[in-house]
């Protein structure tokens, strides 16, 4: 059984969804039989590599969604508590907003080497917890090495247009399946889990799909 997961490394609910999915897998008797593939999706593909409010995530979201600064801050505070409930530490005050394509190119390279999950995990943590700049080449090289890639792998991912094409094709494929937001889990192209659903909901879907 194959699980495809569309995700953006700048999406706070995608990291939470990853944790909930992992919790569901721990309870799923056939977890070892699953093939899991991460897919790229950008929530804001038109974002500049260095946006105007790079060091102010609250202002960025307020401007993009039409919220007040206070509303944006309150929403993020709620997400921090949600993340904490699944064992994640979110430091939005340190987050550096940037276009996520470079990160997705790294993920595409990592997938080819069987390191897709490791790449997602490390890049999520780099952005939400560590306050890393995911547009900075040296930072991406260091993160790539932690994932299990070489400096040459990272350079190849960031310079060869095929990796951008792979990421963009993932997004197009998701749209064809009805994707409107992330995280988006597709189980054997039969069932979909939309959003960071609870482990119980995810487990129920996995068991239903496995039963045929």
Question: Model-flagged regions — what are they?
Answer:
Residues 3-6, 13-30, 38, 100, ...:
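C-terminal cap of thioredoxin/glutaredoxin-like
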Residues 19-127:
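Structural alpha/beta surface segment adjacent to cysteine/selenocysteine redox centers
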């Amino acid at each position: 059984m194959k699980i495809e997961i569309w995700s953006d490394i700048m999406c706070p609910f995608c990291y939470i969804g990853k944790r909930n999915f992992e919790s569901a897998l721990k309870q799923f008797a056939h977890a070892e039989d699953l093939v899991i593939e991460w897919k790229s999706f950008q929530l804001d593909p038109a974002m500049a590599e260095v946006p105007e409010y790079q060091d102010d995530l609250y202002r960025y979201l307020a401007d993009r969604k039409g919220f007040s600064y206070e509303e944006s801050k309150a929403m993020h505070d709620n997400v921090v508590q949600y993340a904490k409930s699944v064992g994640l530490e979110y430091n939005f005050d340190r987050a550096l907003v940037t276009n996520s394509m470079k990160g997705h190119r790294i993920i595409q390279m990592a997938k080819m080497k069987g390191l897709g999950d490791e790449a997602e995990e490390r890049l999520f943590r780099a952005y939400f917890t560590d306050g890393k700049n995911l547009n900075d080449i040296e930072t991406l090289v260091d993160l790539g090495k932690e994932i299990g890639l070489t400096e040459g792998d990272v350079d190849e991912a960031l310079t060869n247009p095929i990796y951008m094409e792979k990421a963009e094709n993932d997004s197009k494929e998701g749209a064809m399946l009805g994707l409107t937001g992330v995280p988006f889990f597709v189980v054997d192209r039969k069932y979909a889990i939309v959003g960071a659903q609870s482990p119980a909901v995810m487990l129920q879907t996995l068991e239903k799909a496995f039963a045929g």
